[in-house]
Amino acid sequence: MNFISTLIIALILRILYLVYRKRNPSFYTVSLVIISLIVWSVKSYLLDYYIIPTSSMAPTLKAGDLIFAKPVDAQKEQLMRGDIVIFRAPAFPSFIYVKRIIGLAGDTVTYTDDKSVQINGRMIGQLNLHNDHTSTYQALQERNAQQYEYVIDNRKPFVKPIYTQWVIPDGYVFVLGDNRDHSWDSRFFENAVGTPRHLRGLVKKELLISRYLATAFTLEFMKSDFDIGENSLKVISE
């Protein structure tokens, strides 16, 4: 949990403690209004919060993780490869997804039948661990030069995507889940009716809501992935 989130929680707990000590109905009302304003302000301008319901971003984000994210202005935010973003699904805006940015404007993304992903001809990541079940790769985030892992399920057959190569135009990003064989992402996304064929699977920057910052804690009762369907991997935000 980062400093800001700790400070906010401490402030709310302090208010609740004062409410308990006062035990005055009018003080209850004022305190609830203050807490509501704090939560609204934080969510609107400083931090977003979400609960992850599936394992599509494992091992980075697990089912049951409560995460904090920074609201983004798609026109001003400098996005980088490796950023984890929360966004509205291209064809179903009521669904909210969380994925990792792999390709930016000007990139050529290639997905091969051995499940590897290349950016401008260079493979993403290096093999770290391999067994009969999974292969784990390590790759680098551009923003902080830290490593992250993504996983390929060796038991799953190759599923042909809508395309095997995308050229990313201005205003769009290409996203993938870290749990590659258990993620519905730019390889398979449907887009709104009328979207040109070469844009299928890509996510408009204007659909981006926020950028992942940190994981606060894991809700134990949600640790087992209750997958609600590969077509509706929804992040609960309200």
Show the residue positions of the predicted features.
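N-terminal signal-anchor transmembrane helix
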Residues: L46-T60
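Internal/C-terminal transmembrane anchor helices
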Residues: P25-L46
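Soluble "head" domains of membrane/secretory-pathway proteins
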Residues: N2-R23, P59-E238
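Short hydrophobic alpha-helical membrane-anchoring segments
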Residues: L11-L18, W40-D48
